[in-house]
């Protein structure tokens, strides 16, 4: 069951149970996906579950009758459902809830029906009729009504099937039989009610001698066996789809009548098979049913040949009723099996693969009865021929030609170009899908391989290459599944190799992935340094003020100036300015179908004033068929990783620029050195934090994971393995870089914001000092003009500059509270960093994320933050404990306090 089907079923179940609020569908979906186990049906387990439900039910007969009815229709997954229901009978609490829910729903339904119900008055009969007239009228009406109703239902069913198949095959409509085919019942070959073999009045059979009675009845039976009413034996009108019944003259001798009743089931079976053949020969029922009907028609012809031979014996006076009963024995068994199959196909409304499943299961059920099994094998082999033709085209050439929608693989109209444009497009998953109802039971285990085989070849065909499997052989049905299993395995291996070689060698998949790694994961630093030097000024602007063509030009220049110039795919790299920041993008991806996503769907994107640095990202042009692997989902993951690292790189550059500009502070007087030292220390702590985080992400997460990906790609045997390895690589990088945990990402984002605000503050202060220094320089130049000696000039320059800077620093301290500002930055940064370390510690122990433990040891390599956290916890515990004076004796040792994150 696909993920989308699970989502749909869980949501529908919650709606039926009227469950609102709570944990939400996602929790139950996750539980179902983690605890899925295949249910293996056995006769014992199915019978035990059935017996348990029957014992629990108030009406066990009705339940068993319904179970047998569904079983006769070959209903899929019936036994797993019965097993689940038997388990529910053991859970009293769940049963009570379901009963209460059913009662409430019934009351609501009754209230809805009651409001729209109107009374109907039945007029009294105008005159009276006798019982005999009433019986005759009932028979006439029943005959007309049943025939017309049955014909209307068949016509309606054909129309529904035709409309459904025309909708799926919009370019090719099914042909239609002319109306006279259905208007002339004599063409069907079944009984015509009310039409006898002669218009002569039949003699009362009770007046005839026993030998004459037997001869007349034999002649009647020969007619009845080919679908024609006799004088003394006639067919009754059908009541729906029930078996044909016959009316035998009651005046017939009892012994003869008993033998007649033994032979009549053959005629009833013939009638059922004939109707089935005529009905399933319509175009709407598909090629499998056509082939089955044709095989049955061949057997019916043999039956007619037998009847004609018996008629010849009868004309020679050599056929008695006893001989007829003897000769008809083999045909009785054959016609009974054919009628049983026809009835089961009708009840189950089987088409295509479901018909083959029924025939296959019936063949197995006749194990031990060689003649019956041989008959079923003949029918199954004939019916499977058109299905295997479609299968061969699919697994040998990647083509689906299924005009009647019978095949297990269904094609959907999707444009392959959208896989690069739309995040939610599922070309690889949804272009071709499995139709569970059309999987023959003998191909159930191979369904996924059959789907993948055709998909692989189809991708190569979409690229303009004609492929034909060199190991192609005709597939013929057999009870030994190994025969066609081996053939499907060979086709799968060939298709896997063809597509894998096509992507790896001709389309250079690995080279494209390396190119993406170079840009999105910052594999080579010189390109990034060049680009940031060129574009940083432009990226500082608000998004609305940025000119994308200018950024594209700067990107092109950076590519040509760096080692990226040797990359053959550098022209596929593009600029993308996202409409929201990284956290919002992450929540949109993680919170699909949740309250958070619904709330954000109504948010105005213009409310967030993003800078170019926050909105900037790369994009990559991927062409078909590489877009199967590097699709929009994968590119979105790459973009999130890039934006995360890009902003870290930007913060690092800002902190380094503060370090460069702070060299001027060495000239400060001792009066200002103390609080300048605090700012420098904080800057170094911030720089240490950012650089260690970057080192962890690039060298402890991405590089090892990338090497694992390259190793896995070399050993991959098919494209699904490649897709799985690539997706696993991205998911691992996102998880270990803290991008799948919104709580960690929010704390990390706050830390980055504190660093950026600190650098802005320091840069403003440095620019102010630089401006005052320039003013001091101008004053010194004025003094030089007055004629001071050269040595004195140099000493005066340094002294004057130091004096101006010290005075400015003291002024800033007094006016703007610079020291208090630095202390506030220090406090906020330390608080957020301690919060991050505490959360990382929790996740590393609870979720066994050992990589996060590496982050902790890297950020707190000397125990500095652990000591601060312990000291903070001790202070809080002392404030919470009341102070009790101690009169004498040494002070008691302080208790050890557990460190907790606040």
Swiss-Prot record:
Gene3D superfamilies: Gamma-tubulin complex, C-terminal domain. Coiled coil: none annotated. Changing residue 615 to P: In CDCBM15; uncertain significance. The modification Phosphotyrosine is found at residue 83. Ubiquitously expressed. Transmembrane segments: none annotated. Keywords: Cytoplasm, Cytoskeleton, Disease variant, Epilepsy, Intellectual disability, Lissencephaly, Microtubule, Phosphoprotein. Pfam families: GCP_C_terminal, GCP_N_terminal. GO terms for molecular function: gamma-tubulin binding. InterPro entries: GCP, GCP_C, GCP_C_sf, GCP_N. GO terms for biological process: brain development; cytoplasmic microtubule organization; meiotic cell cycle; microtubule nucleation; mitotic cell cycle; neuron migration; protein-containing complex assembly; spindle assembly. The keyword ATP-binding does not apply. One of its GO terms (cellular component) is centrosome. It comes from the Eukaryota. It is found in: Cytoplasm, Cytoskeleton, Microtubule organizing center, Centrosome. Residues 874-902 are annotated as: Disordered. Belongs to the TUBGCP family. Component of the gamma-tubulin ring complex (gTuRC) which mediates microtubule nucleation. The gTuRC regulates the minus-end nucleation of alpha-beta tubulin heterodimers that grow into microtubule protafilaments, a critical step in centrosome duplication and spindle formation. Plays a role in neuronal migration. Component of the gamma-tubulin ring complex (gTuRC) consisting of TUBGCP2, TUBGCP3, TUBGCP4, TUBGCP5 and TUBGCP6 and gamma-tubulin TUBG1 or TUBG2. TUBGCP2, TUBGCP3, TUBGCP4, TUBGCP5 and TUBGCP6 assemble in a 5:5:2:1:1 stoichiometry; each is associated with a gamma-tubulin, thereby arranging 14 gamma-tubulins in a helical manner. Gamma-tubulin at the first position is blocked by TUBGCP3 at the last position, allowing 13 protafilaments to grow into a microtubule. It is linked to Cortical dysplasia, complex, with other brain malformations 15: An autosomal recessive disorder characterized by global developmental delay, variably impaired intellectual development, speech delay, facial dysmorphism, microcephaly, and varying degrees of cortical malformations including pachygyria, thin corpus callosum and subcortical band heterotopia. Most patients have generalized seizures. This is Gamma-tubulin complex component 2. It comes from Homo sapiens (Human). The lineage of its organism: Eukaryota, Metazoa, Chordata, Craniata, Vertebrata.
């Amino acid at each position: 069951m696909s993920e989308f089907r699970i989502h749909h079923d869980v949501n529908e179940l919650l709606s039926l149970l009227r469950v609102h609020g709570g944990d939400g569908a996602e929790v139950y979906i996750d539980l179902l996906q983690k605890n899925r186990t295949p249910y293996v049906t056995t006769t014992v387990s199915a019978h035990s579950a059935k017996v348990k439900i029957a014992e629990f039910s108030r009406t066990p007969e009705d339940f068993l009758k319904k179970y047998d009815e569904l079983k006769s229709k070959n209903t899929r997954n019936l036994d797993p459902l019965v097993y689940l229901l038997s388990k529910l009978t053991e859970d009293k609490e769940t049963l009570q809830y379901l009963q209460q829910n059913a009662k409430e729903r019934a009351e609501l339904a009754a209230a809805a029906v009651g409001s729209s119900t109107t009374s109907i008055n039945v007029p009294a009969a105008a005159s009276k009729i006798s019982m005999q007239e009433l019986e005759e009228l009932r028979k006439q009406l029943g005959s007309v009504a049943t025939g017309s109703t049955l014909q209307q239902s068949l016509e309606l069913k054909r129309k529904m099937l035709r409309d459904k198949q025309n909708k799926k095959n919009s370019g090719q409509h099914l042909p239609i039989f002319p109306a006279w085919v259905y208007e002339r019942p004599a063409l069907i070959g079944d009984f015509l009610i009310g039409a006898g073999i002669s218009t002569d009045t039949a003699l009362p059979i009770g007046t005839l001698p026993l030998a004459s009675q037997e001869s007349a009845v034999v002649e009647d039976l020969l007619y009845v066996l080919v679908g024609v009413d006799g004088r003394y034996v006639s067919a009754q009108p059908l009541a729906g789809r029930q078996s044909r019944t016959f009316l035998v003259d009651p005046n017939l001798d009892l012994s003869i009548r008993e033998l007649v009743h033994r032979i009549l089931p053959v005629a009833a079976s013939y009638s059922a098979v004939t109707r089935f053949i005529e009905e399933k020969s319509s175009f709407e029922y598909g090629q499998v049913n056509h082939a089955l009907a044709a095989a049955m028609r061949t057997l019916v012809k043999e039956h007619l040949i037998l009847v004609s031979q018996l008629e010849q014996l009868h004309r020679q006076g050599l056929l008695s009723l006893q001989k007829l009963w003897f000769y008809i024995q083999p045909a009785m068994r054959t016609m009974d099996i054919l009628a049983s199959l026809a009835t089961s196909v009708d009840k189950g409304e089987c088409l295509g693969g479901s018909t083959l499943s029924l025939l296959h299961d019936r063949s197995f059920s006749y194990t031990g009865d060689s003649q019956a099994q041989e008959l079923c094998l003949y029918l199954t082999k004939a019916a499977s021929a058109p299905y295997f033709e479609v299968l061969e085209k699919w697994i040998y050439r990647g083509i689906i030609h299924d005009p009647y929608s019978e095949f297990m693989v269904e094609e959907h109209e999707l444009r392959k170009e959208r896989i690069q444009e739309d995040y939610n497009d599922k070309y690889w998953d949804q272009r071709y899908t499995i139709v569970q109802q059309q999987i023959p039971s003998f191909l159930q285990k191979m369904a996924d391989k059959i789907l993948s085989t055709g998909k692989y070849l189809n991708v190569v065909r979409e690229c303009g290459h004609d492929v034909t499997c060199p190991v192609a052989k005709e597939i013929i049905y057999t009870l030994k599944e190994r025969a066609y299993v081996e053939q499907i395995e060979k086709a799968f291996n060939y298709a896997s190799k063809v597509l894998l070689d096509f992507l790896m060698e001709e389309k250079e998949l690995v080279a494209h992935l390396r190119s993406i790694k170079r840009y999105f994961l910052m594999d080579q630093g010189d390109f990034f340094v060049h680009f940031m030097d060129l574009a940083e000024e432009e990226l500082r602007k608000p998004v609305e003020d940025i000119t994308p063509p200018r950024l594209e030009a700067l990107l092109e220049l950076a590519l040509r100036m760096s080692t990226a110039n040797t990359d053959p795919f550098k022209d596929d790299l593009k600029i993308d300015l996202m409409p929201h920041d990284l956290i919002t993008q992450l929540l949109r991806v993680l919170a699909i179908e949740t309250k958070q996503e619904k709330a954000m769907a109504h948010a105005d994107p213009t409310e967030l004033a993003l800078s170019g640095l926050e909105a900037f990202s790369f994009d990559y042009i991927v062409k078909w068929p590489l877009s199967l692997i590097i699709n929009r989902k994968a590119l979105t993951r790459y973009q999130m990783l890039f934006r995360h690292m890009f902003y870290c790189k930007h913060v690092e550059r800002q902190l380094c620029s503060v370090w460069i500009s702070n060299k001027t502070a060495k000239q400060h007087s001792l009066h200002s050195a103390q609080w300048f030292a605090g700012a420098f220390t904080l800057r170094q702590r911030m720089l240490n934090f950012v650089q260690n985080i970057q080192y962890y992400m690039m060298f402890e997460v991405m590089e090892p994971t990338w090497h694992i990906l390259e190793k896995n790609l070399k050993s991959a045997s098919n494209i699904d393995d490649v897709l799985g390895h690539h997706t696993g690589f991205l998911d691992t990088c996102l998880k270990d870089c803290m991008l799948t945990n919104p709580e960690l990402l929010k704390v990390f984002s706050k830390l980055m914001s504190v660093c950026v605000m600190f650098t802005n503050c320091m840069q403003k202060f440095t620019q102010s000092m630089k401006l005052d220094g320039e003013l001091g320089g101008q004053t010194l130049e004025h003094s030089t003009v007055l004629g001071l000696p050269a040595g004195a000039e140099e000493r005066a320059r340094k002294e004057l500059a130091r004096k101006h800077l010290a005075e400015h620093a003291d002024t800033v301290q007094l006016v703007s509270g610079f020291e208090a500002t630095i202390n506030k930055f220090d406090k906020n940064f330390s608080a957020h960093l301690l919060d991050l370390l505490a959360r990382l510690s929790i996740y590393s122990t609870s979720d066994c994320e050992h990589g996060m433990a590496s982050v902790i040891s890297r950020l707190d390599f000397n125990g500095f933050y652990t000591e601060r956290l312990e000291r903070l916890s001790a202070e809080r515990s002392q404030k919470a404990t009341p102070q009790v004076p101690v009169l004498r004796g040494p002070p008691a040792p302080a208790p050890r306090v557990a460190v907790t994150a606040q």
